[in-house]
């Protein structure tokens, strides 16, 4: 094995362990925020949804700045600083007794993610070859699912005692991740050139093909973020206990660990990336329509299975397509900007979802938010279909090679 290949291999193992810490730290805390503040403290879902949406919007909306800074100064300082900021945000969530404190905590958490997320994704692109990139993203997503279950299990167990224990544990994991990166992450440059901050940002904004693709994904993310807001709430409502939420994440982990990698390997030889993305989005949209009409937990888990099946089909294709369309001269900027769809979709999905949830219950129409989310998914599907049929993107890029 050549030195370059050995460095790539060691780098990928480093990324896998680092990703496990990040996922564990996040999922110990965030799935339980809506349960604690809405179900246990009686806050309005709109207030909590706004906090979650604010975190999503700030982190992903400012991602292009975090990526551009990493293009200029390298990945390591941004990652370490960002993880410490995330830990500080979680500590403030533990102290939240008023909505403004929760909002401030979510902003701190978001700024941390703004700094560490784009360079981490850019490192994946740097350390993987194009033909193996889709499979490595699949491995990361499988790990995300397993980490989500373990994190949710730990968080649910700690919630029995005190929500502050939940937050302090999540903060501790991110401090550990910061130390891990500070000690062992080499001083990688993530772009082929040391691009000035504003030049990298300008390069992305002028790339209309990438710009349109990212904005189109807003609707996709409006659906995907509901695993952090409305799905936990309705599982808790129907099951009658917050402990049932861990089974929702167990479903995700089971499907991801058994199907995500095989689906990615099978479909990459038969379908283009955008076709796989649209197929997954169709399943996610389809699963939304009946949710508000059911009152039995096993039926709900069946619909959640369909939703997660769509996710495991779409996510590797979405990540690989974003990476394939990125200019290697400004990888950090591109990966940062690719989060803009998640910023907009997260803000609209969390805040709008919380408002629709409250409105649906006030009007005695509990199916209202779920039906509208399904419609949004289908509209996004149509927009993606038009984009990729009207804009001819090189077949090599779309196949991920």
UniProtKB/Swiss-Prot annotation:
Record keywords: Cell inner membrane, Cell membrane, Membrane, Transmembrane, Transmembrane helix, Transport
Molecular function via GO: transmembrane transporter activity
InterPro entries noted in UniProt: MFS (IPR011701), MFS_dom (IPR020846), MFS_trans_sf (IPR036259), MFS_Transporters (IPR050171), Multidrug-R_MdtH (IPR022855)
Protein name: Multidrug resistance protein MdtH
HAMAP family documented for this protein: MFS_MdtH
Organism in which the protein naturally occurs: Photorhabdus laumondii subsp. laumondii (strain DSM 15139 / CIP 105565 / TT01) (Photorhabdus luminescens subsp. laumondii)
Gene name linked to the record: mdtH
Pfam hit, one: MFS_1
Subcellular location: Cell inner membrane
Record flagged with keyword Hydrolase: no
């Amino acid at each position: 094995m050549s030195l370059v290949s050995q460095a790539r291999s060691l780098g990928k193992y480093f990324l896998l362990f680092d990703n496990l810490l990040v996922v564990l730290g996040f999922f110990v805390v965030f799935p339980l925020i809506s349960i604690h503040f809405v179900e246990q403290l009686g806050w309005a879902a709109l207030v909590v949804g706004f906090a979650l949406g604010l975190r999503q919007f700030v982190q992903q909306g400012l991602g292009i700045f975090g990526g551009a800074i990493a293009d200029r100064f390298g990945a390591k300082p941004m990652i370490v600083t960002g993880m410490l900021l995330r830990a500080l945000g979680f500590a403030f969530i533990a102290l939240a007794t008023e909505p403004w404190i929760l909002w401030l905590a979510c902003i701190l958490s978001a700024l941390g993610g703004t700094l560490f997320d784009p360079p981490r994704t850019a490192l994946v692109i740097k350390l993987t070859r194009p033909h193996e990139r889709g499979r490595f993203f699949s491995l990361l997503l499988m790990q995300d699912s397993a980490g989500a279950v373990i994190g949710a299990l730990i968080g649910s167990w700690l919630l029995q005692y005190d929500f502050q224990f939940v937050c302090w544990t999540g903060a501790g994991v991110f401090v550990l991740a910061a130390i891990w990166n500070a000690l062992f992450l080499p001083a990688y440059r993530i772009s082929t050139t040391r691009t000035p901050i504003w030049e990298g940002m300008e390069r992305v904004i002028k790339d209309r093909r990438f710009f349109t693709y990212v904005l189109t994904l807003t609707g996709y993310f409006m659906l995907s973020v509901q695993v952090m807001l409305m799905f936990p709430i309705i599982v808790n409502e129907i099951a009658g206990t917050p402990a049932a939420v861990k089974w929702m994440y167990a479903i995700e982990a089971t499907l991801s660990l058994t199907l995500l990698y095989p689906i990615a390997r099978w479909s990459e030889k038969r379908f283009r990336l955008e076709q796989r993305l649209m197929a997954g989005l169709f399943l996610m949209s389809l699963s939304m329509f009946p949710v508000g009409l059911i009152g039995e937990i096993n039926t709900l888990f069946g619909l959640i299975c369909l939703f997660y099946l769509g996710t495991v089909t779409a996510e590797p294709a979405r990540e690989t397509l974003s990476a394939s369309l990125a200019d290697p001269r400004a990888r950090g900027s591109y990966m940062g900007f690719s989060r803009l769809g998640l910023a907009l979709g997260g803000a609209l999905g969390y805040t709008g979802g919380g408002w629709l949830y409250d409105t649906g219950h006030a009007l005695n129409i509990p199916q209202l938010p779920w039906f509208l989310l399904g419609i949004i998914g289908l509209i996004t599907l149509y927009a993606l279909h038009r984009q990729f049929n009207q804009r001819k993107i090189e077949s090599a890029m779309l196949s991920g090679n």
